[in-house]
Amino acid sequence: MSEQKLALNEYLKTDSDYLRGTIKEGLDSSVTGSFSDGDQQLIKFHGFYQQDDRDLRNERKEQKLEPLYSFMLRARVPGGVCTPKQWLGVDEIASTLTSSNSIRLTTRQTFQYHGIPKRNLKTIIQGLDREALDSIAACGDVNRNVMCNPNPVESKLHAQAYEVAKKLSDHLLPHTRAYAEIWLDEEKLLTTEDETVEPVYGKTYLPRKFKMAVAVPPDNDVDVYTNDLGFIAVAENGELVGFNLTAGGGMGSTHGEVETFPRLADDFGFIKTEDVMKFAEAVMTVQRDWGNRTNRKRSRLKYTIVDHGYEKFKAEVEARAGVKFEPKRDVVIGDRGDRYGWVEGVDGKWHLTLFIESGRIKDVPGKSLQTGMREIAKIHKGDFRMTSNQNMIIAGVAPEDKATIEGLARKHGLLGQVLTQTRGHSIACVALPTCPLAMAEAERYFPEFIDHIDALQAKNGISDQAIVVRMTGCPNGCARPFAAEIGLVGKAPGRYNLYLGANFEGTRLNKMYRENIQEAEILAELDALFARYAVERNAGETFGNFTVRTGVVKAVIDAAKDFHG
């Protein structure tokens, strides 16, 4: 049998001189606001994507103008923690160098800028560098931003888990100096040993993106089972002793292609804290060597485990780590939401969690969110923690400073909004007009959609029940819709696939209930189901579990076999 041809991206990576390509030349060109096709793939490793305003695409085409190109830049902020000083720098960049004039908190605990003209990219990256921030490996076929539960109650355990997340992020960064040379004007160093440039990744990096999270039970706001690699903290007497390791999660799929599917990670066993780096590197290098490099739609770790088998994969990871898994420890995985309002930590400091709808921090009529965050940053003595639910925690507030912080938050609309249980558990991706993959609206439409859900819950007397609702403009799954009790995935403008049946804790996927339907049909279906749920539910039964128990949808047990079936 002839050898299969590699995916185009593999050749691009091989020939890129460790992610340099012709990015520098493209950056210097004023002929177009775009990069070349090849460099558009390489710039992802540097932390940004090329986009254009799709609302204006046809108009500009009629005017014989190229699309209004801009860039989305995503920062690397392991664990989502930054200082007030850093935030002021982040805010200044958003206000002066982007057309969106906003900061977008992401579902992976970092922030994005939208609407960056090519000419401003270098200035922005240098501005982030001055604040000890960067965007390297925030995108691309590498380990992405490492998530970690903010967990403001168990501060000591959070601090230990956060240190692990930071070490994972730093240890698994690409070693190439391309980022420093192109964006920070550092000199290129001569090298003769190809593979020593990237001791973990090698010349072709990973077959596909790689996502990692550290969870601190009982919280699961990081949706640990949706990640390629997860570490679930195990504590004894309040001290971190190790982790249950999970591997093989991932949300992305392609409409109509049954060989692609979302998947939740498998449990592999317990590892000691001192062995975390060994196992992380072992899992990544197995994926590097075994992952599919011919078909990018089947290149994630989840498919590697499915194709090679759990036991074979586990044995290879143990062999490379030089350590065997112990039986997994018992831990309780619970709520995926954030604790809104004030929460006192074990150290006597207070933490204020702010609900940021769809993560968009921007001044709009009636809500000066960006100004409010800026004013808080000017006086705050603790830190800021971005959550994977697109929210913000003002962390480490002394008791005597609470009133001032709360006053600013209320003045600028960061506090005081009516927040239902379901809205507090809802997230959406950006989608239109900037995301090139979006087939339907998400962020711009989602607040209105949640208004409808809230009204239906109130009508049926179930407003006290939190339901995890998520919406994306395409099946790539950035807002993790396939792990939502109600998931909406864009199929075409104004049309979505409706998924039901994931559980509240995030340990079971949902399943398609209705395909390619519009708002009126979606709401009619949910109204009928809410009416049944109100009278037929068992005590304490969540909506997702109800839809499975009553046969509305079948439980997804093995995604490779039954997600589409």
From Swiss-Prot:
PROSITE patterns: NIR_SIR (PS00365). [4Fe-4S] cluster binds at residues 429, 435, 474, 478. The keyword NADP applies. One of its GO terms (molecular function) is NADP binding. Gene3D superfamilies: Sulfite Reductase Hemoprotein, domain 1. Pathway: Sulfur metabolism; hydrogen sulfide biosynthesis; hydrogen sulfide from sulfite (NADPH route): step 1/1. Pfam families: NIR_SIR, NIR_SIR_ferr. One of its GO terms (cellular component) is sulfite reductase complex (NADPH). It catalyses: hydrogen sulfide + 3 NADP(+) + 3 H2O = sulfite + 3 NADPH + 4 H(+). Its cofactor is siroheme; [4Fe-4S] cluster. Coiled coil: none annotated. The keyword Transport does not apply. SUPFAM superfamilies: Nitrite and sulphite reductase 4Fe-4S domain-like, Nitrite/Sulfite reductase N-terminal domain-like. InterPro entries: CysI, NiRdtase/SiRdtase_haem-b_fer, Nit/Sulf_reduc_fer-like_dom_sf, NO2/SO3_Rdtase_4Fe4S_dom, NO2/SO3_Rdtase_4Fe4S_prot, NO2/SO3_Rdtase_4Fe4S_sf, NO2/SO3_Rdtase_FeS/sirohaem_BS. Keywords: 4Fe-4S, Amino-acid biosynthesis, Cysteine biosynthesis, Heme, Iron, Iron-sulfur, Metal-binding, NADP, Oxidoreductase. Binds 1 siroheme per subunit. Its EC number is 1.8.1.2. Component of the sulfite reductase complex that catalyzes the 6-electron reduction of sulfite to sulfide. This is one of several activities required for the biosynthesis of L-cysteine from sulfate. HAMAP family: CysI (MF_01540). Alpha(8)-beta(8). The alpha component is a flavoprotein, the beta component is a hemoprotein. Belongs to the nitrite and sulfite reductase 4Fe-4S domain family. This is Sulfite reductase [NADPH] hemoprotein beta-component. The lineage of its organism: Bacteria, Pseudomonadati, Pseudomonadota, Gammaproteobacteria, Alteromonadales.
